[in-house]
Amino acid sequence: MNFEGKLVGTDLKVAIVVSRFNDFITNRLLDGAKDTLVRHGVEDSNIDVAYVPGAFEIPLVSKKLAQKGEYDAVITLGCVIRGATSHYDYVCNEVAKGVSKANDVSDIPVIFGVLTTESIEQAVERAGTKAGNKGAEAAVSAIEMANLLKQF
């Protein structure tokens, strides 16, 4: 038997957790995610957005939203750009671990859509220019995974 999640968002309710830090990038990711959800049939009224100060705060809020029982998926969006210190490594590792843990404590998908880039140029490329929009890609993953998990 094969199981696959369809890319149909009708009747799905989705939460998006987005970081305000580097908002010139995260706003583009958010726009891409919301546009993709709506294009796949998710009603705009079924998309809730929670803003957090930075990427480090994403895991806690995504876990709380996932545990509420109101959503079919949670999408996380943020942008961490390497600087001159090791802060980048700590933030990236903890955000990835935290989002993974949020998946472990809920029955819905928590999708990792946080950019971890070496430069501002890489971030811009992944927020809607030549490398696509990773927010849109995260939305597609959320729809597919939400529909897949409904089969179990």
UniProtKB/Swiss-Prot annotation:
Q: Which reaction does it catalyse?
A: (2S)-2-hydroxy-3-oxobutyl phosphate + 5-amino-6-(D-ribitylamino)uracil = 6,7-dimethyl-8-(1-D-ribityl)lumazine + phosphate + 2 H2O + H(+)
In the UniProt record, the signal sequence range is none
Query: Known EC number(s)?
Result: 2.5.1.78
**Any Pfam family:** DMRL_synthase
* Cellular component GO terms, alphabetical: cytosol; riboflavin synthase complex
| Residues that bind (2S)-2-hydroxy-3-oxobutyl phosphate | 84-85, 126
Chain positions recorded as 5-amino-6-(D-ribitylamino)uracil binding sites: 21, 55-57, 79-81, 112
InterPro entries in the record, alphabetically? LS, LS/RS, LS/RS_sf
| UniProt-listed GO biological process terms | riboflavin biosynthetic process
Describe which pathway this protein belongs to, using the record's wording: Cofactor biosynthesis; riboflavin biosynthesis; riboflavin from 2-hydroxy-3-oxobutyl phosphate and 5-amino-6-(D-ribitylamino)uracil: step 1/2
The entry's keywords? Riboflavin biosynthesis, Transferase
Keyword Transit peptide belongs to the record: no
Q: Which GO terms describe its molecular function?
A: 6,7-dimethyl-8-ribityllumazine synthase activity
- In this protein, the active site sits at 87
Question: What family does this belong to?
Answer: Belongs to the DMRL synthase family.
What does the record give as the function of this protein? Catalyzes the formation of 6,7-dimethyl-8-ribityllumazine by condensation of 5-amino-6-(D-ribitylamino)uracil with 3,4-dihydroxy-2-butanone 4-phosphate. This is the penultimate step in the biosynthesis of riboflavin.
HAMAP family attached to this UniProt entry = Lumazine_synth
* Oligomeric and partner information: Forms an icosahedral capsid composed of 60 subunits, arranged as a dodecamer of pentamers.
| UniProt protein name | 6,7-dimethyl-8-ribityllumazine synthase
- Name the source organism: Staphylococcus haemolyticus (strain JCSC1435)
Gene coding for it? ribH
